[in-house]
């Protein structure tokens, strides 16, 4: 599995939340998001979308697992608020990223493999304070399933790498520098 390391900047998004097992909650959230975009004739303006996996399905009851379907806030968007559509800022930081081409049905297995096997093998630790996510790079409405490109992203921190010091002499994380180090080491 090819894995790159990337530092994501925080981004403000519109989101729709689905609750329940990930297969069902993702379908519900994307249905609500696409419906809202279509109401405003805005779907074609979306160039990238994010799927956020908020909970660990192994430790959270299935009916409480949360999934957020997200699109970046467009600067000229003057859409009125709608029930079920919120606004939030995705946290930035370092992520281990695998680019998948093909069916969305494979994303859960890829996230699990990246999380449980690849990240530990590369001396990284998962940052459970940030969500696992997928970055959807094309529109499934116009892209054949075999050509759909999705980045599968697991938030990471190093296990054994010195952190830079801040002004007070305490260790302070610098995730941009971390991402550069990881990219060189990868």
PLM features: residue spans?
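A solvent-exposed interaction/effector surface
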Residues: 1-186
């Amino acid at each position: 599995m090819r894995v790159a390391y990337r530092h994501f900047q925080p981004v403000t998004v519109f989101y729709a939340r689905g609750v329940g097992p990930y297969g069902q909650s993702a379908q519900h959230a994307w249905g609500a998001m696409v419906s809202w975009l279509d109401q405003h004739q805005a779907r074609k303006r979306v160039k990238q979308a994010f799927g956020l996996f908020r909970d660990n399905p192994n430790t959270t009851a299935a009916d409480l697992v949360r999934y957020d379907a997200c699109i970046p806030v467009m600067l000229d968007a003057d859409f009125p608020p709608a029930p079920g559509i919120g606004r939030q800022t995705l946290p930035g930081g370092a992520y281990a990223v695998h680019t998948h081409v093909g069916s969305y049905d494979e994303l859960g297995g890829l996230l699990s493999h990246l999380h449980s096997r690849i990240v530990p093998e590369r001396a990284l630790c998962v940052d459970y304070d940030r969500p696992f996510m997928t970055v959807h790079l094309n529109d499934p409405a116009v892209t054949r399933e075999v050509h759909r490109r999705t980045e599968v992203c697991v938030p990471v921190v190093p296990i054994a790498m010195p952190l830079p010091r801040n002004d007070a002499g305490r260790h302070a994380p610098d995730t941009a520098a971390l991402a550069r180090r990881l990219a060189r080491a990868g």
